[in-house]
């Protein structure tokens, strides 16, 4: 089982059962100070966070990862250069690169390609899984055909996909991404935070559900989705 809480923009808090059978809480791209965020940075005082995954170092994705890691003792997981930066800032980190499974004993995790930009290392997506659920967070990316390999190799149950356009895929491209990845559930992200990335998630839902068996779950910031 996984409980996915949307924190606005591309930020998520996810609770799942780890490979060791214990409950794990992870954050992905925790820009907690985003304009749509339902939580405050102070809400993470005395919280148990196991891992913080950062897809790239743009401010709306690296976000508040360092502050939260210092407060909670969470390990930051990301491309080598981001993990090195985290260590320089005094927090624990796990460095990896795009390729195979990361050496994390209690979770399945893989850094995937993303078509974007980043100042520290390559931009990535991430596939993260526990005992019974696998989730793909695409990070910031354009559409690319190798998304079909992410679906083939890792079979994510849930795909978290940007739909806002301008900096990432728009609705049309994100629909094609769903067709390539073939997740059971797709959750849109990275839209309506700023004017340039204004998009209609209902249009995304209509197009996906009329062309694929995938179900689209639209989350407002602060809402949660439990799978299965």
Curated annotation (Swiss-Prot):
Keywords: Hydrolase. GO terms for molecular function: hydrolase activity. SUPFAM superfamilies: Metallo-hydrolase/oxidoreductase (SSF56281). The keyword Hydrolase applies. InterPro entries: Metallo-B-lactamas (IPR001279), RibonucZ/Hydroxyglut_hydro (IPR036866), UPF0173 (IPR022877), UPF0173_UPF0282_UlaG_hydrolase (IPR050114). Belongs to the UPF0173 family. This is UPF0173 metal-dependent hydrolase Smar_0891. It comes from Staphylothermus marinus (strain ATCC 43588 / DSM 3639 / JCM 9404 / F1).
């Amino acid at each position: 089982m996984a409980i996915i809480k949307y924190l606005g923009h591309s930020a998520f808090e996810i609770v799942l059962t780890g490979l060791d059978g214990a409950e794990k809480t992870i954050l992905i791209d925790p820009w907690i100070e985003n304009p749509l965020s339902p939580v405050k940075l102070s809400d993470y005082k005395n919280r148990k966070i196991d891992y913080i995954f950062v897809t790239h170092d743009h401010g709306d994705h690296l976000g508040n990862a360092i502050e939260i890691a210092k407060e909670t003792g969470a390990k930051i997981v990301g491309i080598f250069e981001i993990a090195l930066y985290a260590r320089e800032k005094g927090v624990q980190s796990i460095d990896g690169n795009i390729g195979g499974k990361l050496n994390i004993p209690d979770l399945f995790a893989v850094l995937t390609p993303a078509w974007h930009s980043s100042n520290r290392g390559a931009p990535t997506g991430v596939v993260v899984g526990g005992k019974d659920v696998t989730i793909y967070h695409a990070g910031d990316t354009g559409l690319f055909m190798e998304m079909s390999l992410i679906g083939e190799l890792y079979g994510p149950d849930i795909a978290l996909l940007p739909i806002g356009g301008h900096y990432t895929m728009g609705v049309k491209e994100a629909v094609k991404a769903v067709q390539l990845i073939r997740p059971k559930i797709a959750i849109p992200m990275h839209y309506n935070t700023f004017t340039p990335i204004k998009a209609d998630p209902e249009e995304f839902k209509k197009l996906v559900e009329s062309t694929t068996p995938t179900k689209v779950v639209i989350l407002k910031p602060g809402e949660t989705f439990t799978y299965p």
